[in-house]
Amino acid sequence: MVNWQTLFMVSLRRQGSSSRYRYKFNMENITHQVFPRCKQAFKKANLSYEYCDLEGKLYNASLMDLQKMLLRDINAPRDHVFKIVRTDLVEKSSKKRIQHWEQIAPIFDHPLSLYENLLSEMDNDFKPSFEWQQLIEVRSRDDQLKLQRVVWPKSIFSNFCRGIGVKKNTYDRLLKQNNGEVPMFVNPANAKPLPLFQVGDDATIGEFDGIGIFPYFVVKHRAFFVTEVDKLKTKIISPLCNLNERKRTDKANAGRLLENEKGEPFYVDAKGAASRAADGNAVTLKQLLERSVSHKTLWSKQTNKDRTCPGDILRATILSNDFSIRQLRTEFCKNFILYNIFTILQRNKKSIRDFSNDNNVPSFRFNWNVWDSYIWKQYQEAESMTLPADQASLINYKTKYDSFLQDLQTYSTLVISEMKWNQFSIFQNNETSLSRFEHITLILQTILTKSKMIRIFQPNLYKFMQDDLRATLMELTGFTESINATIGPGFANEQSLQSANALKKLANQLLHFEQKIYAEKFRVNRPIQLRPLTLSTNFKIVILDKQNAIPEIFQTLLKFTTQITTYFVKDLSEVELHGHMHCIDKKMLDKSTFMYLYELKYNEDLKAVPPQKEKIVDNIIGLLSNDEEH
C-alpha cells in the first residue's frame, strides 16, 4: 500500500527554494486558466455540444452522477463543449447561470458552459438519459391499495411505464387483500392503468415495495410481455412528460435514489447521507466542496483571493470512487508531487538549447540508463490502456495511473540525485551529443505533455505544463519517433527489468527510512513545517549486499538520494559504527539484500520489550542476513 503522505514529504523536501516555483504560489493561477479557455471556446461558431441532463442544480448533484459526467468528459471528442440540461421543474423566469460555476468548471477537462438549458428549450433530437432516481408512491384504481416505495426513473420518463413489478410475497399479499384478484395500479403522471407483474428475487428492488416496468429502456422488462401485440407496445416511444405530468409524479415522490455502477438503484435517505458526511464521506458536490474548506492551507496561502480546492484534486477524488476527505488529502498529495516533478524542468530551462531557429537540427544519439528505460516502459504500458468507459474500467485505470505516478516520483528523485552527483557534467553537450540533462528533459517532457493518464486525472496542471513547455526540443529532434527503436534492444531482457526493479525498491526503502527520521506531521490546519536537514547527522543507513550484486553506479546514485550517510557492505562487520549507534529499523529487500537504519543514542534507557510479532520479524531478518551464501 502506497503511503502518499510519505511521498508528499519526500517531494516537499526536494522542492525549489524560490517561491516562484512553489506549489501554493502557482496553484490558483493554474486553476484559473480554465476561465479564459472556456470564454475562448464558446466564442467559436458551430459548436459541438455534449448535453448532460440533470435533475436539479449541478452544485447539488450527487457525486455518482458527477462521476458519470466526468466519464463522458474523458471520452468526448476534443473539440466538444459541455452544457447542462435541467430536466427537473424549473421556472422559466429563473436565472439560467450555473450556481458556483467558478468552482465547478475547473473539475472538467472540456469547457463547461456558464449557462444551463431547460428541457423545454431542447429540440426533439435531444434524449435525456434513463436512470433510476427516485422512489414514488403508487395507488390502486379504487385507492384501497398502495405501494409506498416503488423504484422509479426521472419524472420525465413516467409515460413510458407499462406496469409495476413486485416480488412473490408482495404479489401474494396484494392478491389476498384484493379478494384473490390481481389489482390494477395507476400511473401518477397520467392516470393510466399499470398491471401488476411478479418479478424474481434477482430483480433490482432490494428492500423496496416494487419497481416500475419500463421495457423500452430495460431489456429484461420485455420478458413480461408475451403476445405479439404486447411486444409491439414495448417498442412504442411515449412522449416525455409535460410540466403538469412531472408535477404529479413529483407529488408522489417518496425519496431519492441513486444508481450504482451496474445501473442498479439504491436508496439514499437524508439521515443516512448526513451520517456518511459526518464520517468524512460526501454524497453531493456541495458537501465535498464544503468539507474541503478545512484543508485550504494545503493548497493556498492566506493572501490568495480564491482558496477553493483545485479542480484537479476534486476531479481525481470523484474519479477515484472514494468520496471521503481522506481520499481528497491523498489526491492533493499526488497533485503536489506531479507539480514538483514538472518544476525540475521549469527550474532548469536555461540548460536546454533552443533549436527553434535552426533549420539543420542534428540527429542525436540517446544513451539510456536503466532508470530511464524503466520509466519509459511504464509510460508505454500506461498509454496503451484503453480509456475507461464505465466505473469498473475507471477503477482499473485509476489504479494504473497511481502506480505510474509512484514510479514517476521515484524516477524524479533519482534524477535529482543524479544532478547532485554530476552537477557540472550533467549539463555538458556538443554539436552531436545531447547533455545528460537534455536527455532527461526529453523523457520527462514527453511524459508530462503527452500522457493521456495525466490529462484525464490532472487536466488543469497538464495544460499548464503544455503551455509552459511549448517551445520544446522534443518536437524538433523527432524524439518520440526514434525512441522506441533506441530503447527496445537494451531493455527487452528480463535481467534489465530485474535490475531496474531492484533499484526502485532500494530507492523507495531509502526514502521510507528518510521519512522515519524526519517524521514531519502532515497537518491541514496550518502550514507543514519541515525539520532541519542536519537532523540526519545522527543517523546512518547500511545496505548489506551479500552477493555484491548492486552495481557501483547504483550505489553512487543512491548515496546522493538522501542526506543520510549511506554505506554498502558485503558483511556487517565492515561497518565502523560508533559505540552508541543502535539499529532502530531493518528491512529485507530480497534474500541477499538488507537495509538497516542506525541512530546515535546517548544515555539510552533500557528499551521496552518489542511486541511479539515485531520481535519474530526482526529475528527472521537477523537470521537471514547472517546466513552464509553457499
UniProtKB/Swiss-Prot annotation:
It is found in: Mitochondrion. GO terms for molecular function: RNA binding. The keyword Mitochondrion applies. One of its GO terms (biological process) is Group I intron splicing. Keywords: Mitochondrion, mRNA processing, mRNA splicing. One of its GO terms (cellular component) is mitochondrion. Appears to be specifically required for the splicing of the terminal intron (bI5) of the cytochrome b pre-mRNA. Can also stimulates the splicing of the omega intron of the precursor of large ribosomal RNA. This is Cytochrome B pre-mRNA-processing protein 2. It comes from Saccharomyces paradoxus (Yeast).
